[in-house]
């Protein structure tokens, strides 16, 4: 069991957190592990795991690692993963695990087989259903024998209308995608890069999907921009964990960049590029995606240091607009699904079982922000500043509120402090 704990610590813990948090973890455990202060950065994940196994023989230091991850908002999902792995080793959730193996993977199949066992085989049930439908259709046709031709025509028309209804139903479901990909407003987002027609954008998007490797981070309708664009970095957050569509825990960070005429919010899914996203640094990006005004950079994108001749001068008005926050009264008027970024003052905090309600307020009004997952009960209090990244507007019973999504991030600035050092590297 001890070896299992060490495996979790090393493979599911230390190897999955970035260098910054690993350095922070080593600093906090320096005394327990007798780490030399001058050589802390030289210790590898394997060496730390070996030391933890010796220092904490009961669980190889897994408990310490979980406590650390729980205290760091960006690593709370990692803490949940580690606790689940630990419970599986101790056998606390063996029944739950067996239920999950039989359930979530094939819920529809299981249900259909249960029904089939009560009523006969699934295929037979389907045949009975189609027979009943055919009988109903025959009865309807027989109500007016003299108008058989008209009835047939109406039947064909009805079938066409049903097909159209199915297509419309599918089309209505198509926009269901991560909240951060919804339509933004001009008040809090930069304009779209190209003003080409939607038809040409769809054609370009279709070509890009064929030529580019599949990437689940790319939202539907995103447009690939292969030509280089030189920008100046304004801000960048620390990397944080998020859950991908494949239910894998990955890392990303948010940034804001600007050209000579506009600014953009950026989602960066390759944290190896973090060093390039430093304040006032000039970079040239290419092979990036644009979706509703938000730029997305992944592993296939190119980010290079800009040459001296490529340096640009960003007007002060662009920088001011990029750093400005939308008024809450304007947020309340927004359309459901609209994405918002901004810094707001926390007025009230109410912790619930599944989520936390953060009421933010400015001179124009107040609005509720709902935080769940790793943004549930974050370390903040009234008067603190909450810097919200990629929160989308939702309406419940006519009341607007901001809700977190897969790519949402919250940066807390304590009351009395001008700015946290990790906001901009």
Swiss-Prot record:
On tissue specificity, the annotation reads:
Mononuclear phagocytes.
SUPFAM superfamilies this protein is in? HIN-2000 domain-like
- What region holds the Pyrin domain? 1-88
Q: Which domain of life is it from?
A: Eukaryota
Induction and repression of expression: By lipopolysaccharides (LPS).
Against InterPro entries, the record matches this protein to: DAPIN (IPR004020), DEATH-like_dom_sf (IPR011029), HIN-200 (IPR040205), HIN200/IF120x (IPR004021), NA-bd_OB-fold (IPR012340)
Q: Where are the sequence repeats?
A: 129-135, 136-142, 143-149, 150-156
Query: What residue spans carry the Basic and acidic residues bias annotation?
Result: 86-99, 159-176
Q: Report the main location listed first in the record.
A: nucleus
Subcellular localization is given as:
Nucleus
Q: Which residue ranges does the record assign to the HIN-200 domain?
A: 213-413
Q: Subunit comment for this entry?
A: Interacts with HOXB2.
| Protein name from the UniProt record | Interferon-activable protein 211
Which species?
Mus musculus (Mouse)
